[in-house]
Design a protein with these regions (language model features):
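Bacterial N-terminal signal peptides that target proteins for export
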Residues: 2-12
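Bacterial N-terminal signal peptides
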Residues: 11-20
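Boundary at the C-terminal end of the N-terminal hydrophobic targeting segment
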Residues: 24-28
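Structural signature of tandem-repeat unit edges
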Residues: 33, 55-77, 87-100, 110-126, ...
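Consensus positions within tandem repeat domains that build extended binding/scaffold surfaces
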Residues: 79-82, 103-107, 135-139, 156-161, ...
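Short, compositionally stereotyped local motifs that mark structural "simplifiers"
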Residues: 876-957
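Alpha-helical segments with a strong preference for the paired helices of cellulosomal dockerin domains
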Residues: 961-983
Length: 983
């Protein structure tokens, strides 16, 4: 922005100054073509050159003195804007008495080619009233080529800024200051020699002097200001004076051709000025040709990002006296191969050597107490790091991704190692953590951040942990895939979250008896671990702590453990034996899920919960789901509720002992337990939840205790061998499909307190199907209080022969007995007719027996009136006759199974299982081409036959395709037919 300072304003300032000095008002006059105003200097009459009514042009000579009113006055000043806009001014000779030149004095003098400011001039620029105002004294002098400064001691801002044709600058020995922005953007200056008299080179004095190649700074200069030489791209040589004490931030930033720099011993600061307290130093940032740096003896703090991205820097000499290597000091200096850190250094700052990709070794002396975050991160050539005994703190990510680091020796006093400190050091083979170390963790600024201190150190084989390391931190050794030997010393109390997760070669580990917590995922996926002994000191085993330890065969859980959290041993497929300590109270959801080799487990009396943790309130329990080798379960006395799917798909489970005290059998609790033969539910249980015994195809008998109030939907569905069910006296609700497809069930007695045979409220449009397709069911007794009945409750029970309805039953629902084609007698004891759906029955050939007093009503009311025979109960009810299908036979010939039965018109229901479809973990499996066949015969109106089991050994004789015991041409025909069928 250009500031216009008018002649009138200049006069007002001169008048104000005169008034303050108690002198007469100034008078303007003209002499020799130059305009003046009267002033007083040091008590003597003087004159100041001012702007005339016409622009000055040509060659102007300002005399030493001028005559006015008969007296002689010294010409002591050139006022502000005196020659402003004099575009045809060629030259100016300044008189010997001029001591000051005002701001914008020669602004826009486009033809002025040279200016020689004599030694008598002390001030160029602003006056005291405008100390922050840019001087711009020669701004816009676009033809100016040569400048000579004599003994200037005070200089305002931007005196020669933007004079793009200045080539030569001569600074006199009396000059003491080079002001802010003085030669900024003077793009043709090639050399600068600063004399010894100069004390200060101020902010941006030579910024963007892009042609500058050589700089010599005299021994008198004590400070170089902020960005003083920033952007001098072609500066090749810079010689700094011996008295230099301070260099401001970014002073030489972007000097891309600068090759070397020697910082004098008196230098104490490479930093920002106080106006930029949060600004990085960046003093030599981006000096991409800089190869050599020597730092002075008194430079204690090197400042932040001082040599950032000096990509050619090879040789760095840090003299003793340096105490701080600042944040990012050598960040991105990709050619530093080695550096000697003197034993005066106390702190290595954050990112001090970040990305020094040529650095091979580092020796941190004992004087250093702190290594900052990311100090050596991404030093990919670093092979060896020795950390002195004085270091107490290694910051976050200090050596992260030092991918070739093979040896790291830690000093004895290291107390804290930050998160990801050695993350990704893929060639690090061994680490010994000192006994003083207390923390492998994040700093307080990252309280939720995982430690990951040695994560992904893929070559790490051996780790020894110190005595004072109480908390090992989260994910500290995660994915150290070569780690075999771990020594945890007494003193450790917490094995952190994910600490050894993915360490696939840890085969054994001793956990000391000081450990109290094994946190979540601590040993997740340690696939070589074969046994674990958890001491009594441990109180909590976290979620997924040993999940996926696929070779773990034995686990002993100490008596101090109270909580065994979610998925703690999930997918430990070879785990055969688990001893659970006497104090365990809670086993979390899926804690032993998919432990397919687990044959036995001791569930102690203190265990109260098989459930999810509080973080997964909607998650199924599934604690022992798919433990296919588990044969027997005895529940402890304090288990009050078994959560969802606790023993689901335990296909080898044959018996379960549910103690009196358990109140809830959860959803899908025993679903898919195909070997479970019987279950007795004690009176303490009040609810059997949905699908609790769904698909227990081996169950023969179930006794439901008198305390059970609710059996939810599908609770015993597909229990295909269930022959007998005893329902407790307090039962009130049976949910939809509760006993659907229980094809072996022969009789059902609905207790008198049952009010509902129905769907739950989530399925209001769903048919009940409570006993649908119970193909062997012969007799049904409906209780006294049934008031709600959904559709199709006993549909497709095609062998149902007798229905007994007790007096008090209020309703018989839609299609209740639909498809019950073989019903012979219905004994309805209801004096008051139940509300009966029009389609409740599909077979009206059965004999209906009703109370004598209601006989007429039944005969007059549909659908009861549709029955062909309606008699009174008092007249006697005959016992139903029972016929049964003959037992089927099974033969194999011509590549086919052939079923036969003596009962005419019988159908066959069979199931064929190929025994070659196997699950296991053995290294060798014999394929025997064996098929297991189960079959029974059925026919409407009579009882199903007995079930036949048939074993077929196919092709036992090699080549005997048709199974006739002889290998001949007939076998070839059979094989061809089999192939054609397959195609």
């Amino acid at each position: 922005m250009k500031h216009v300072f008018s002649k009138k304003r200049a006069y007002l300032l001169l008048i104000a100054v005169a008034a303050n000095l108690g002198v007469a008002s100034a008078e303007d006059f003209e002499s020799g073509g130059i305009h003046y105003t009267t002033t007083t200097t040091d008590g003597s009459p003087s004159a100041t050159v001012i702007k005339g009514s016409d622009a000055y042009s040509g060659d102007v000579v300002i005399p030493a003195t001028v005559e006015f009113n008969g007296g002689t006055r010294k010409v002591t000043a050139i006022s502000a804007e005196a020659f402003n806009g004099c575009i045809h001014l060629k030259s100016v000779t300044i008189g010997s008495n001029v001591i000051s030149i005002g701001f914008k004095a020669f602004y826009g003098c486009e033809e002025l080619e040279e200016i020689d400011i004599p030694a008598n001039v002390k001030t160029i620029g602003y006056n005291n009233a405008y100390t922050s105002h840019p001087s711009e004294t020669f701004v816009g002098c676009t033809s100016l080529r040569k400048v000579t400064l004599g003994s200037v001691t005070s200089m305002g801002k931007s005196v020669f800024e933007g004079c793009t044709n200045i080539v030569t600058v001569i600074l006199g020995e009396g000059c003491t200051v080079i002001g802010n922005n003085c030669f900024k953007d003077c793009a043709k200056i090639k050399t600068i020699e600063v004399p010894n008299s100069v004390k200060s080179i101020e902010e941006k004095a030579f910024e963007n002097c892009t042609a500058l190649t050589t700089l010599t700074i005299g021994d008198g200069v004590t400070s170089i200001g902020v960005e003083a030489f920033k952007g001098c791209f072609h500066l090749r040589t810079a010689t700094l004076g011996s008295a230099l004490q301070t260099i401001g931030h970014s002073a030489f930033e972007g000097c891309e051709d600068l090759e070397g720099i020697v910082l004098p011993d008196e230098l104490t600061t490479l930093d920002y000025d106080h106006g930029y307290t949060s600004h990085p130093s960046e003093t030599f940032k981006g000096c991409i040709s800089l190869e050599s740096v020597t730092l002075g003896k008194k430079l204690a703090n090197m400042g932040s990002d001082v040599f950032l991205d000096c990509t050619a820097l090879k040789n760095v000499t840090i003299n003793e006296g340096c105490s701080i290597i600042g944040n990012g000091c050598f960040n991105g200096c990709t050619k530093i191969a080695g550096i000697n850190i003197p034993n005066t250094v106390v702190t290595i700052g954050e990112k001090a050597f970040f990305g020094c990709t040529a650095l091979k070794t580092i020796n941190v002396p004992a004087s250093v107490t702190s290594i900052g975050s990311s100090a050596f991160q991404n030093c990919t050539a670093l092979t060896k790091a020795t950390i002195g005994n004085g270091v107490t703190t290694i910051g976050n990510q200090a050596f992260q991704e030092c991918t070739h680091l093979t040896t790291a020796t830690l000093g004895s006093d290291v107390r804290s190692i930050g998160f990801k400190a050695f993350y990704g050091c893929e060639e690090l083979e061994e680490i010994v953590l000192p006994d003083e170390l207390t923390t492998l963790d994040y700093d307080h600024g990252y309280t939720s951040h995982p430690s990951e201190t040695f994560k992904n150190c893929k070559s790490l084989v051996s780790v020894t942990l110190g005595k004072k390391l109480a908390n090992m931190g989260r994910d500290a050794f995660m994915d150290c895939t070569s780690l075999k030997n771990v020594t945890i010393k007494e003193g450790c109390t917490i094995i952190g979250y994910g600490c050894f997760k993915g360490c696939v070669k840890i085969a054994g580990l001793t956990i000391p008896n000081t450990v109290e917590i094994i946190d979540a995922e601590a040993f997740y996926g340690c696939t070589a671990l074969t046994a674990i002994d958890i001491p009594e000191s441990v109180t909590n085993i976290g979620g997924m702590a040993f999940m996926g330890c696929t070779n773990l065969t034995k686990a002993t859980i100490g008596d101090g453990v109270i909580t065994l959290d979610y998925q703690a041993f999930k997918d430990c497929i070879k785990l055969e034996s688990v001893h659970i300590g006497s104090e365990v109270k809670t086993i979390g959801h899926q804690a032993f899920m998919n432990c397919t080799s687990l044959a036995e487990i001791n569930l102690t009396d203190r265990i109260a919960t098989f459930d999810y943790d509080h973080g997964y309130t909607s998650h199924p329990s599934e604690t022992f789901k798919n433990c296919t080798s588990l044969t027997t379960i005895v529940l402890g006395k304090r288990v009050t509720a078994m959560g969802t799917g606790v023993f689901a798909d335990c296909t080898g489970l044959k018996s379960v002992d549910i103690h009196d005290g358990c109140e809830l059998i959860g959803k899908s609790c025993f679903s898919g337990c195909t070997s479970l033969e019987s279950v007795e539910i004690p009176a303490s249980v009040t609810s059997i939840e949905a699908q609790a015994f769904y698909g227990c195809t081996g169950m023969l008998k179930a006794i439901v205790g008198d305390g059970v109030v609710t059996i939810e939907e599908k609770a015993f569905m597909d229990c295909s061998k269930l022959e007998s069910i005893t329902l407790g006296s307090e039962l009130r609700t049976i949910g939809f499909s509760a006993f659907r497809n229980c094809v072996a069930l022969t009789e059902v007695v609905i207790p008198d307190y049952v009010t509902t045979l129905d769907y739950d409220h989530s399925y209001t449009s769903h048919p009940s199907n409570t006993f649908t397709n119970c193909a062997a069911l012969k007799r049904v007794t409906l209780g006294k209080r049934i008031s709600s009945m959904g559709a199709e409750v006993f549909s497709k029970c095609n062998n149902l022969q007798q229905i007994i309805i007790k007096d008090g039953c209020k309703v018989i629902g839609s299609k209740c007995f639909d498809g019950c084609s073989n019903t012979k007698t219905i004994i309805n004891n209801c004096v008051e007719l139940p509300e009966t759906a029009a389609n409740a029955f599909s077979n009206y050939t059965a004999a209906l027996y009703v109370p004598a007093e209601a006989l007429a009503t039944y005969k007059a009311t549909e659908p009861w009136s549709k029955f062909g025979t309606i008699s009174t109960i008092e007249g006697g009810v005959p016992e139903p006759t029972t016929d049964k299908c003959a037992t089927p036979t099974v033969t194999f010939a011509g590549g086919e199974l052939i079923f036969a039965c003596e009962t005419e018109g019988a159908e066959f229901v069979y199931e064929i299982t190929n025994a070659d479809v196997k699950k296991g973990s053995d290294s060798r499996v014999k394929l025997d081409c064996t098929y297991q066949v189960t079959v029974y015969a059925k026919k409407d109106g009579i009882e199903n036959s007995e079930t036949v089991n048939y074993k077929l050994d196919l092709l036992k004789m090699v080549g005997d395709a048709n199974g006739d015991g002889v290998i001949d041409a007939a076998d070839i025909v059979t094989i061809v037919n089999i192939i054609k069928t397959a195609e």
